[in-house]
Design a protein with these regions (language model features):
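Intrinsic-disorder/coil detector with helix-boundary
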Residues: 1-176
Length: 176
């Protein structure tokens, strides 16, 4: 699956980087409880779904090539290059939820669940669950279009979408 997502700034993720979900979990799963003062809080119960092991090995092998440099060239060729040089590619755990986040504190709190958490989006957990249920390898690759903060806008949607589609197309071409 391709598209866009939010990156976790505290992990060094930047706009226009590329996120590949090594695993996914639903950050909204757990039990909603009440504090003594009556306020609600979530007792999280994350269920992590990993990327298919064979696919993970192929991704790691592919990332050893100069794929980041090639992707940057493709961005420049299509007049989509962002101000930074070569985008970083993060193959790391992702979090998935049912709402769009524009809150720096919430984004930082995700690191309490997994210190390597790097991406936040809305479809990956369902994709990975379906893949595991059907015994079909699947992969989530998304461009970082925002950092889940109040500066969120649509400015990087096109670049993020292009990068994720370019990566998946070239990865599949490489392994088949």
């Amino acid at each position: 699956m391709t598209g866009i997502c939010a990156g976790i700034k505290d992990r060094g993720i930047e706009l226009c980087d590329l996120f590949i979900a090594e695993s996914e979990y639903d950050y909204g799963s757990g039990k909603l409880a009440k504090n003594q003062d009556g306020s609600s809080f979530l007792k999280p119960e994350p269920k992590v779904i990993p990327c298919d092991y064979t696919l993970k090995t192929k991704i790691n092998d592919y990332l050893r090539s100069d794929v980041d440099v090639s992707m940057f060239s493709a961005l420049k060729d299509n007049n989509l290059a962002f101000g930074k040089n070569v985008p970083s590619i993060h193959f790391a755990p992702g979090a998935c939820g049912s709402y769009v986040i524009a809150n720096e504190d919430f984004m930082s709190s995700l690191l309490a669940t997994n210190r390597k958490m790097s991406g936040l989006e809305m479809e990956g957990y369902g994709l990975y669950v379906a893949g595991h249920m059907l015994n079909k390898p699947c992969l989530l690759v998304k461009g970082i279009a925002d950092l889940g903060d109040t500066a969120k806008d649509d400015k990087f949607h096109t670049i993020g979408s292009f990068m994720s589609a370019w990566f998946v197309y070239n990865f599949l071409k490489n392994i088949y």
